[in-house]
């Protein structure tokens, strides 16, 4: 079985996501053939960002990684599994699904990440290695993680950038900015 045999990319919408994103007014595509990556400023307004931050602050827990690598400092951030029943979370999820065209049943629960001064998530991928220890746990039923959608909720005084090693592109935090990239190559 091939890596994505259990996910019908033609019916999931994931194969058309780049085309849909490219048609969104104001969206910018990274000028590289190495990665399908898009950025949209102002995706969320200040009130929505503040409401999500309040939920994250209330329900935060230490972040984890799917496939432990023995490096305790690999990911030092905190995480919140946002309540999928919350009206604000529902509205944001609906906007994300409308934007990408990927049906909701192929999406993962929304999480919020918090990075305090000095915290980080070292270089990693958002897709799962089919030969890794985490493949059966995370991909046997739902399939490979095809697209990642990330929204910055605030602008720290310093730090907070997301760097893509494959392209050399670094994105600075800007409240409400959406980053979307394809993990399947």
Give each language-model segment a name.
Residues 1-180, 184-185:
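Fe(II)/2-oxoglutarate oxygenase catalytic core
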């Amino acid at each position: 079985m091939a890596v994505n045999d259990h996910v019908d990319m033609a019916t999931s919408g994931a194969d058309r996501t780049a085309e849909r994103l490219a048609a969104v007014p104001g969206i910018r595509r990274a000028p590289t053939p190495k990665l399908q990556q898009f950025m949209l400023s102002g995706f969320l307004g200040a009130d929505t960002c503040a409401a999500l931050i309040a939920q994250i602050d209330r329900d935060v827990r230490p972040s984890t990684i799917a496939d432990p690598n023995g490096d305790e400092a690999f990911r030092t951030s905190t995480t919140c599994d946002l309540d999928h029943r919350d009206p604000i979370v529902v509205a944001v999820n609906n906007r994300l699904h409308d934007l990408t065209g990927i049906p909701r049943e192929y999406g993962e629960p929304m999480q919020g990440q918090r990075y305090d001064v000095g915290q980080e998530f070292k270089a990693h991928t958002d897709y799962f290695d089919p030969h890794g220890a985490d493949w059966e746990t995370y991909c046997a039923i739902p399939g490979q993680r095809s697209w990642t959608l990330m929204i910055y909720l605030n602008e720290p005084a310093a730090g907070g950038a997301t760097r893509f090693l494959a392209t050399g592109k670094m994105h600075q935090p800007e409240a409400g900015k959406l980053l979307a990239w394809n993990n399947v190559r």
